[in-house]
Amino acid sequence: MIRPFEEQDSADVVALSLRAWGPVHDSLREVMGDELFDLRHRPDWKAQQQRDVESVLSDDANRAWVAEQGQGVVGFAAATIRPEDDLGEVLMVAVDPSNQGRGLGTELTEVATDWIRESGMSVAFISTGGDPGHRPARRTYAKAGYRELPIAYYFKAL
């Protein structure tokens, strides 16, 4: 069941996001190398990810949803709209590893996209990495009807 996020879900959402994004960060470390990865994810990726998730969940401009199974939260998505640009962004999607590969990420992405559409926006977008760790996310977004735009980001340790 997917329902709107409630404040009491926050700790569960943070915990599942850390589990879900562990393999992604392992892949990023491999692609970026230890030095650059550590510089980019100070003090460590888990602390940064927790701050990022908590920030998205606490921002009143955003909307979030959770997927429940049994008594637990097993996935979430968050989105925002930018009326001045006539677009919305799916900010985050995460599914607990034990529930991945069953279409839940696509379903959460579609719920967020529906909210963007219902908010009157003409375009929705989502961004993700091109590294191997983000391959499941890219498949999820393609299944939800998003088209990939090849964009490259370059980083350099200073």
Task: Show the residue positions of the predicted features.
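Acetyl-CoA-dependent GNAT
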Residues: 4-91, 96, 109, 115, ...
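Residue-level "edge-of-site" marker
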Residues: 84, 129, 154
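Structural preference for beta-strand elements that scaffold enzyme active sites
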Residues: 87, 123-125
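A cross-family glycoside hydrolase active-site/sugar-binding cleft signature
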Residues: 91, 127, 152
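Conserved acetyl-CoA-binding loop-helix of GNAT-fold acetyltransferases
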Residues: 92-95, 101-114, 118, 139, ...
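Conserved beta-strand-loop-alpha-helix junction that forms the acyl-donor binding cleft
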Residues: 97-100, 125-137, 157-158
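Conserved acetyl-CoA-binding loop of GNAT-fold acetyltransferases
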Residues: 141-151
